[in-house]
Regions:
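C-terminal interaction-tip segments
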Residues: 1-41, 102-104, 110-126
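Beta-strand-rich interaction surfaces with strong enrichment in secreted/lumenal proteins
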Residues: 33, 77-79, 96-98
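Extended extracellular/luminal ectodomain segments enriched in beta-structured repeat modules
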Residues: 38-46, 55
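Buried hydrophobic-core signal for structured, non-transmembrane domains
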Residues: 45-50, 107-109
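Extended, low-complexity, turn-rich repeat/linker tracts enriched in Gly/Pro/Ser/Thr and Asp/Glu
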Residues: 51-59, 113-117
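Short, surface-exposed beta-strand/strand-loop-strand elements in extracellular ectodomains
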Residues: 55-76
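Short proline/glycine- and polar residue-rich coil/turn motifs
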Residues: 78-87
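Beta-sandwich interaction modules
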Residues: 86-104
Length: 126
């Protein structure tokens, strides 16, 4: 145990575009890798999900992957939205994440419907 506080040494942003429908909740099927931990581990402070077009009601699933198995971490409900000049596309922004992930772990994502989303994780490497 360290006698001094440990802070992220360098900021890090991970981004993936997902679009392959995956109805599985068990971590199998197509998952996009959003953020991978550095050699000394990493932390994730914020997760943003943004649709790139029209969405139907569905779910974005976030997983913690330990290098072998993906474990469901969170689900984000997606609203049906048709973006236009006056209507914004679907967006989810969680600024209260605070996940610490060790070396070899990653954050992964999937979409229940075949619609394109950009999944962004912001944090830092130790």
């Amino acid at each position: 145990m360290s006698t001094t506080p440990q802070y992220a040494a360098s900021p890090k942003t991970g981004i993936v575009a997902i679009s392959t429908a995956n109805a599985n909740r068990d971590g199998t099927g197509t998952l996009g890798t959003v953020f991978t931990a550095a050699a000394n581990g990493s932390r994730i402070d914020r997760i943003i999900v943004t649709a790139t077009g029209t969405t139907t009601a569905g779910t974005i699933r976030l997983y913690i992957h330990n290098g072998t198995t993906a474990y469901l971490y969170d689900e984000v409900s997606v609203d049906a939205i048709t973006p236009s000049g006056t209507v914004s596309a679907f967006r989810y922004d969680n600024t209260n994440v605070n996940i610490t992930i060790p070396t070899g772990y990653s954050l992964r994502a999937s979409t229940a419907n075949a619609e394109t989303f950009n999944v962004i994780a912001m944090g830092g490497d130790y």
